[in-house]
Amino acid sequence: MQQKNWTIDLEGMMAAGIHFGHQTQRWNPKMSPYIFTERKGVHILDLTQTARLLSEACDLVFDAAVEGKEFLMVGTKNQVTDLIVSAALKSQCHYVNEKWLAGTLTNWVTTETRLRRFQHLQTGGDLGEFDRLPKREAAILKGQLVRLKKCLGGIQYMSDLPDIAIITDQHEQSIALKECSILGIPTICIVDTDCDPDLVDVPIPGNDDARSSIRWILDKLALAISEGRSNIKVT
């Protein structure tokens, strides 16, 4: 694994509020190695641990990107949907930022069928084919297209299972995380003080509620992937 300087500074993390955990009564004891202290009933994360693990995660995705690996970013909470799209587009990653369809990965054959249907409908819409259909039939197809785009738009060019998944919230994306675990897909996940770090391959201790925190972490990972892609090996 190639080590690089990703400018993961404590001041930047503090300004982004990455160190703020949940109230002390809402915690998972497995997170104790990553907790620095408590303040006014709130756990404060140890940012030196966050810096170490985020740096390791950046090194990992950089090396994977150099090898031409594919990434999937997942974040479906309202406050992060646009952040997921932004980070994914910057780093040419696939993403899910709306509803996660159960079986998206574990039932990949069905997902491929849905993707083909989505692409067929999208092409038909682009060519104006809906305009030549009866209104009721056109409305049904347009409704299907909207629903499929919401769930599959970010993975429409994903031709196979991803090599690495980046997940922003362990609880919100528990099904996605479980599917990755079943399939042996390595996961990088932000873990707040109420999370179980044992459920992910590379935990990044951090505030998984604040936009500023999630954006800061995603930006670092997206930068590492982008730099890796610019150094991609040609075989």
UniProtKB/Swiss-Prot annotation:
Q: Which CDD domains match?
A: RPS2
- Any one GO molecular-function label of the UniProt entry: structural constituent of ribosome
Matching entries from InterPro entries are given as: Ribosomal_uS2, Ribosomal_uS2_bac/mit/plastid, Ribosomal_uS2_flav_dom_sf
Recorded hits in Pfam families, A to Z, give: Ribosomal_S2
Keyword terms, alphabetized: Chloroplast, Plastid, Ribonucleoprotein, Ribosomal protein
* Subcellular locations according to the entry: Plastid, Chloroplast
Q: Which GO terms describe its biological process?
A: translation
Please give the superkingdom of this protein's source: Eukaryota
Which Gene Ontology terms of cellular component type are present? chloroplast; mitochondrial small ribosomal subunit
Which SUPFAM superfamilies does the record cross-reference, listed alphabetically?
Ribosomal protein S2
Q: What is this protein called?
A: Small ribosomal subunit protein uS2c
User: What is the source species?
Assistant: Adiantum capillus-veneris
